[in-house]
Swiss-Prot record:
This is Indole diterpene prenyltransferase nodD2. The keyword Acyltransferase does not apply. L-tryptophan binds at residues 85-86, 94. Transmembrane segments: none annotated.
Length: 434
């Protein structure tokens, strides 16, 4: 192993290179996406100390089941064919590393697309995500798409109606936010699959608020959603409260597991929220659902969040907790949260996404902040030497970044912080689009 604890591989023998040589590509689009995706994933897995056979397994899965649904490559000017707000510049995929106690885990999220996406044959890109999920069934026999079917029935829009709706809205930024379906993977002991679906288009079509569409949909699911109703009622109560109005926070989409070891009704569900506010007091208020989530573990989580917040965000010295951070203009500068709903649970479990892409310190300062935070927790695995690993993984010899730290998520699970760092690939650095 080298000084970061990584297993050495010769530059000519990287798993991603071997797979490219052995499997090839059906077209230049997939060849391009592999050139920007695979080396970064390979380096992240070495950072997380994945054994070589696991690296091959993950990369082979990505080659077969993600690559065909990345859509056309960018234009010569760098324009993304089907941009979404999964990243602020529209890059359609985003890897992340989760750090939890003595383990680091690779995850990948992406917005499936194809040549039909945005055309009159598929104006709001509903085909590619479903095709991607169907395609991967053969290696994920436990995949259950019942939740996908439920929300597809409720929120997908007939093609003719979608054409008319898109023409009526005619708002590029809205279209990038209103993603009908995203897919995420957790490459742990087995491949976990998460699907996110948004009711934004349905909200416009029906004229209802997004929150109303979400709550009504869950109620209409009957027995499928009955074991989640206690948690949902807490979220709905908070969403309609004066506290939520002051925080300008609203739900935006739902997320659920589809590759399950048990019945689909054992799935974890999530409801995502977003707010333009950045005052620390507001973050705590949303994180605790206005004080509805409380107790020693919540108190401990807030203590840890207070340490992490200025470690990665550009918080001015002596900045008051009740004031927003100095504004850095971007049309979608928000802080996101999600709330996990487990069947039979009485209360949701909160998670916050610290918006380093909008309000972060510079890249090395973020890396130093994360390493310092890990040290306060007593985490000391080789992959917790964060700054050194980040430089080794994402810096070029010329001092450019192959990927930037786009978001840092934080939650608390089993009395321990649960931290994920999301890396936005810098396509212009990783590979020329033409």
């Amino acid at each position: 192993m080298d000084s970061t604890g990584r297993q050495p591989l010769s530059q000519d023998g990287q798993p991603w290179q071997a797979l490219a040589s052995g499997l090839g590509f059906p077209d230049e689009d997939q060849k391009y996406w592999w050139s920007v995706m695979a080396p970064l994933l390979g380096e992240l897995m070495k950072w997380a100390n994945y054994p070589v056979d696991k690296q091959y397994l993950v990369l082979a899965f990505c080659h077969e089941y993600i690559l065909p649904f990345c859509g056309p490559r960018p234009t010569a000017e760098g324009g993304i064919f089907w941009p979404t707000l999964i990243t602020k510049d529209g890059t359609p995929f985003e890897p992340s590393l989760n750090f939890y106690k003595n383990k680091a885990t690779l995850r990948v999220g992406y917005a499936p697309a194809c040549e039909l996406s945005g055309s009159n044959d598929d104006p709001i890109n509903q085909r590619a995500p479903i095709a991607a999920l169907e395609h991967q069934k053969r290696v994920l026999p436990q995949q259950n798409l019942k939740w996908v079917d439920n929300f597809k029935k409720a929120w997908f829009i007939d093609n003719d109606d979608a054409v008319a709706l898109k023409a009526r809205v005619h708002n590029e930024l809205f279209e990038q936010a209103a993603v009908q379906c995203l897919i995420g993977y957790v490459f742990s002991d087995y491949t976990q699959v998460k699907v996110a679906m948004s009711p934004l288009w349905k909200s416009v079509q029906t004229g209802q608020q997004i929150s109303r569409v979400i709550w009504d949909t869950f109620r209409q699911l009957g027995d499928d959603a009955s074991s989640y109703l206690d948690c949902l009622s807490v979220l709905e109560e908070y969403t309609e409260s004066k506290q939520a109005k002051l925080a300008q926070v609203q739900p935006s989409f739902v997320n659920f597991d589809v590759n399950l070891k048990g019945d689909y009704q054992q799935s974890r569900l999530k409801v995502y929220y977003a707010t333009p506010c950045t005052a620390f007091d507001t973050m705590v208020q949303v994180f605790t659902l206005g004080g509805r989530l409380k107790g020693p573990e919540v108190d401990h989580a807030i203590e840890c969040l207070r340490v992490l917040w200025p470690s990665v965000l550009a918080v001015p010295e002596n900045h008051p907790d009740d004031q927003d951070l100095p504004r850095r203009y971007h049309s979608v500068a928000v802080t996101q949260f999600n709330f996990e709903l487990w069947p039979g649970a009485k209360l949701p479990v909160p998670q916050i996404y610290l918006p380093t892409n909008f309000y972060g310190r510079d890249e090395l300062e973020i890396a130093e902040g994360l390493e310092g935070f890990f040290k306060t927790l007593g985490w000391s695995e080789p992959f917790h030497a964060y700054k050194q690993n980040y430089i080794a993984t994402c810096a070029t010899p010329e001092g450019k970044w192959k990927a930037i730290q786009h978001d840092v998520s934080f939650s608390f699970k089993d009395s321990s912080p649960y931290v994920s760092v999301y890396y936005k690939p810098e396509l212009s650095v990783l590979s020329s689009p033409s």
